Amino acid sequence: MKLNKIMLAMVVMSISGTAMAHGYIENPPSRNFLCNAQGGSLNKDCGGVQYEPQSSGETADGFPQQGPVDGKLASGDNWVSVNLNQQTAERWTKVKMKAGPQEFKWKFTAAHPIADFKYYMTKQDWNPNQPLTRDSLDLTPFCVIPGGPASTTGSTTHTCNIPERTGYQVIYGAWDVSDTPGTFYNMIDAEFDGATGEVVVSEWTKSIGNIEPHDDLNAGDTVKLRMFDQQGERSDLVVEITIADAKEGKKNNWSHALASKLNNTHQDIRAGKKDSKGTVTATHGANAIFINANSNILRAEVQIEKSPAGEVSATDASFSANGMKKEYQMADGALAIHFDVKTMGSMDLEAKVFAADNSVKGYKDMTLEDASQHVSIAMTGLKAGKHTLVILGTDAQGKTQQQSIDFMVKGETVKPEVKPEVKPEVDGANKQCTAPAWSNKSSYQAKDTVTHNGRIYMSKWWADKASVPGDAAVTDTTGNGSGWGKVWEDKGAC
């Protein structure tokens, strides 16, 4: 019996010094805690860390000289939290924050002696669409809390003075334990008010639910958004979409389609992400559902009706992207970027272009299996400045890979030469002017001729419905057909 007690004591000591020596920032809620059910599961697609937020970021101590490598500051060496390394301006739920005194509460799964706590923050001008690195952070901690004996209550709280910041910032907290060479690193995604201190009042003040795209859907599956008021379900307000094909069934696509249909159907309900101006816009991913003061809806629910499921591959995969330029010249606020992607295995790829204000200016998705593809993303409404292309790949097992590429958009520094209008004589000007008017309900083959806004255009190759003749991003105005990547050629006035 005595031997058994000794063995039991040894086991307990072993557990407390390793597996149970874990913890996380509970308040303000850290990125990993917001993945967990106790944190409200507000962060999605987190991987295994949703079940054990206390294990996130467990790595060697000594940051910034040692510790986690750049690009893996959230996960460190712990595989359970690798998804937390994904980084875009819209990826993670934000916590409202302001400069000044702020309490930080760490939750421990077991008592463990403390060396110290250190807190760092991103620089004001960091790029939130690049994986987090040491260069993203102010490497002088804004707060250092000396250590002490192990907590006897399962948690500890201390106060730090938050520096001045505006917009989206990341607070990087490190708990250094004193009896092992390890440190636990946690991130807090913080949202500070703008530099003016003005608070934008949005009409979309109350959230009544979410569109959470957990899974891809199959052709024939149906998604319904159901509304409820004090009397029960409002069948007259149901919004429904049916998945037509595999592309529409991608989780970020069907969530965007459902949110867009809701926004186009009802005046007092909106789904999407709320920007700094209080506007709610449908997004590819999780969409919050808001109501304004005119609505009596209390809650909204998403219902998915499945058809027979298709096959799912379980093969590991990876991708690479290249061919992006360092800078592009826009015309009338528009341009198209071109690049090539290649996959090893099968991957769902999602490409987004973020402007300097973190608004999404371009989007494209595709699925490739051991293949290469040239990708073009046409964008309008651009402003000169830094932009970031973020490509996120997901394989059949849910493993992700991110590649972020910065590029500059230049303004129109040189006015294009105004050429005298010459009516085309090939086939006779009058004959070409009788060509059919361009329609956004039709696609066109090579050499098709159309008229639009008083001018004649000829398609150089197949043109889809979204390519509008005359738009700078898709129209060649060189007069000699040399405009690379532009499907329509301007043949002159009609």
UniProtKB/Swiss-Prot annotation:
NCBIfam families: PRK13211.1 (NF009690). Residues 1-21 form the signal peptide. SUPFAM superfamilies: Carbohydrate binding domain (SSF51055), E set domains (SSF81296). GO terms for molecular function: carbohydrate binding; chitin binding; hydrolase activity, hydrolyzing O-glycosyl compounds. It comes from Yersinia enterocolitica serotype O:8 / biotype 1B (strain NCTC 13174 / 8081). This is GlcNAc-binding protein A. Probably interacts with GlcNAc residues. May promote attachment to both epithelial cell surfaces and chitin. CDD domains: ChiC_BD (cd12215), LPMO_AA10 (cd21177). Residues 474-494 are annotated as: Disordered. Residues 435-484 form the Chitin-binding type-3 domain.
